[in-house]
Regions:
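Electropositive, beta-rich accessory/interaction domains or terminal extensions
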Residues: 1-131, 171, 175-216
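A short pocket-lining beta-strand/turn micro-motif at the edge of beta-sheets
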Residues: 31, 149-151, 163-165
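Conserved binding-pocket/active-site segment within a compact domain
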Residues: 125-131, 135-138, 144-145, 158
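Short amphipathic alpha-helix initiation/capping segments at coil-to-helix junctions
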Residues: 154-160, 175
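Short alpha-helix capping/helix-loop boundary micro-motifs
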Residues: 96-98, 150-156
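Short, basic/aromatic beta-hairpin or loop at an interaction surface
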Residues: 83-91, 136-149
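Loop/turn positions that initiate beta-strands
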Residues: 107, 158, 162-164
Length: 216
């Protein structure tokens, strides 16, 4: 299990969401990249040095510090879409190999390289920017049907990471709430929502959303 690439975004115009810019255009970088907890959502800060987000209402902050997607899932989408998908094209900071990102448990911890420890926090929910960026009508619906969302992570221990660093799972919590389960519950299968609250590491924002939806 390893990192294939560490990807950092460059600002691009965002005509799809009425914002001045988007950071979804992430490209692999050479050499070490510093990773640190960015603080609360709302500033545009994220976990990787040199990266940022512009939709500060929905992205960034402690619980969405880093976004990871598996190369194996990108390869699957390449076959389905009939086009090459380079590392970073889904807006992911970390492109991994040998990890079941969607099967990771909320609260699972990964050590990357010698120093950095990240914790799985939640699933990526697609937006209009993602659909516009890929230039595929109906992409959000297709992405949701596949339930291969990739994972957001929070920073537990800071440090530097680089492409080809090993990734080790150092903790798996005692529950069955995976990234894919969270995604399915939040999008197409609301009957699964009550199962999510057993995951202590789920962001408070998501827990509150679950409570509202299940008590309405």
């Amino acid at each position: 299990m390893k990192l294939l690439s560490v990807n950092v975004g460059k600002p691009r115009p965002n005509p799809w969401k009425g914002l001045s810019a988007t950071g979804i255009d992430k490209r692999p970088v050479d050499g070490p990249v510093a990773v640190a907890a960015p603080g609360p959502k709302g500033t545009g800060a994220v976990g990787l040095a040199g990266d940022r987000v512009y939709d500060v209402k929905h992205h960034g902050g402690t619980d969405q510090a880093v976004y990871s997607y598996a190369r194996e899932d990108l390869d699957g989408w390449e076959a389905e879409l009939g086009r090459p998908l380079v590392n970073g094209v889904f807006g992911e900071n970390l492109t991994t190999a040998g990890l079941d990102v969607n099967g990771a448990l909320i609260g699972e911890r990964w050590r990357i390289g010698p120093d950095v420890v990240l914790e799985i926090s939640c699933a990526r929910i697609p937006c209009a920017t993602f659909e516009g960026w890929l230039e595929r009508d109906g992409w959000m619906r297709r992405f949701m049907q596949a339930a291969r969302p990739g994972a957001y992570l929070r920073v537990i221990e800071p440090g530097d990471i680089s492409a080809d660093d090993p990734v080790e799972i150092v903790h798996r919590p005692d529950h069955d709430v995976t990234v894919a389960l969270v995604f399915r519950a939040m999008t197409r299968e609301p009957e699964l929502l009550p199962r999510l609250l057993i995951a202590d590491a789920l962001p408070e924002e998501d827990k509150n959303l679950v409570r509202r939806r299940t008590t309405a």
